[in-house]
Amino acid sequence: TAIRKCNPRT
């Protein structure tokens, strides 16, 4: 899961 990479606001 690369949440920070795809959605830096998260």
Curated annotation (Swiss-Prot):
GO terms for molecular function: toxin activity. Expressed by the venom gland. It comes from the Eukaryota. The keyword Secreted applies. The keyword Lipid metabolism does not apply. Its main location: secreted. One of its GO terms (cellular component) is extracellular region. Keywords: Secreted, Toxin. It is found in: Secreted. This is Toxin To37.
